[in-house]
Amino acid sequence: MTALSSVDFCLPEHITPEIFLRDYWQKKPLVIRNGLPEIVGQFEPQDIIELAQNEDVTARLVKTFSDDDWKVFFSPLSEKDFQKLPEKWSVLVQNLEQWSPELGQLWNKFGFIPQWQRDDIMVSYAPKGGSVGKHYDEYDVFLVQGYGHRRWQVGKWCDASTEFKPNQSIRIFDDMGELVIDEVMNPGDILYIPARMAHYGVAEDDCLTFSFGLRYPNLSNLIDGISKGFCHQDPDLNLSEFDLPLRLSQSEQRTGKLADENIQAMKQLLLDKLAHSEAFDTLFKQAVASAVSSRRYELLVSDEMCDPDEVRSILEEDGAFLSQDNNCKLLYTENPLRIYANGEWLDELNIIESEVLKRLSDGESLDWAFLSDLANKTEDPETSMDLLLDSICNWVDDGWALIE
């Protein structure tokens, strides 16, 4: 069995995960030279141009006609969109781990950040001079150079008051503030940029930049999850206390008026109730887990069906492992242990299945010896292994697991 601790992270030798999270994460940018050499050669520019034209892909084509004339075109893109291009342009493809499990496995190099914060891997191709302008993002990102070279400038912190160029189809601005980074990234280099920090990348030649994006849920995500929890109540979760009418003091007022003090009183009663309700604590935990394990993009799976005997045969070979498919968002909560995959709570797992998925979500790769040991600890090892192999087939078919 290979555990998470054996994975080599993409940080410099002198920066441990603890140091990075303390001194850099959401505080300041960091250049990591040759931090991810494994990405070099996985894609070439033509691969991305062709992929962007796939009808199932989420892509954007940004054309720069002048400093004040930017146009963006959204998927579906076709070959016609790539004809008569201006000198400066870029094409961006989202959710690239959907199309390359090998690329998706590189998420493990960022395992010092919990996977519930992962968004997706985006790739940007641009010829010399191509860019998407000076901008900032609402999420943290590791920009990895996979092909060619790109010059990156990182400047000021931005917020809701940051002014954008008017009449443009993308959110860009002119004022980068004082530059804190002005570097050319080579293949394999990484640039970490915190959320809301101005940055500007320009292709030095034909280049591919891969963005490993990380983000948090917003309040609307959580409120939506809580609402669904009330609508589809867990039979083990007693939410009847929330069905009781609110008791409000009454003051004289017009017949048709809903007074502000009544609204504020209801708000305070609600907040007090939420703060002292074990049932709501459980519901909120479920809502958070569901929100952060949900994918932004539709999951595409193969039509081919996995065979349990074939899975057994492969896993019995030396060097074969079961691991998480990083195209899936897999996580767990504790007290009690609950497993979530792509926004769903998996509430019908047995003990062995829960243990396997928990370890996969922690970045471990499991071999046949480990899986057999789990089954051998049960009263009926043969039946337990047969059930586990059936489940592994379902996980592979659903895009949750890989057999390597």
UniProtKB/Swiss-Prot annotation:
* Keywords recorded for this protein, A-Z: Dioxygenase, Iron, Metal-binding, Oxidoreductase
Co-factor: note: Binds 1 Fe(2+) ion per subunit.
Q: What is its EC number?
A: 1.14.11.-
- What GO molecular function annotations does the UniProt record carry, in alphabetical order? 2-oxoglutarate-dependent dioxygenase activity; metal ion binding
Which Gene3D superfamilies is this protein grouped with?
50S ribosomal protein L16 arginine hydroxylase, Chain A, Domain 2 (3.40.366.30), Cupin (2.60.120.650)
Q: InterPro entries, from UniProt?
A: JmjC_dom, NO66-like, ROXA-like_wH
Q: Which domain of life is it from?
A: Bacteria
* Top EC group: oxidoreductase
Report residues binding Fe cation: 135, 137, 199
- On whether Manganese is a keyword of this UniProt record, the answer is no
Q: Mind telling me which residue stretches traverse the membrane in this protein? A: none
- Ranges for the JmjC domain? 102-231
Query: Would the keyword Metal-binding be found if you checked this record's keyword annotation?
Result: yes
Q: What cofactor is this protein dependent on?
A: Fe(2+)
For this chain, the family text in UniProt reads: Belongs to the ROX family.
The entry's function note states: Oxygenase that catalyzes the hydroxylation of a ribosomal protein.
Recorded protein name is Probable ribosomal oxygenase HI_0396
Question: Can you name the source organism?
Answer: Haemophilus influenzae (strain ATCC 51907 / DSM 11121 / KW20 / Rd)
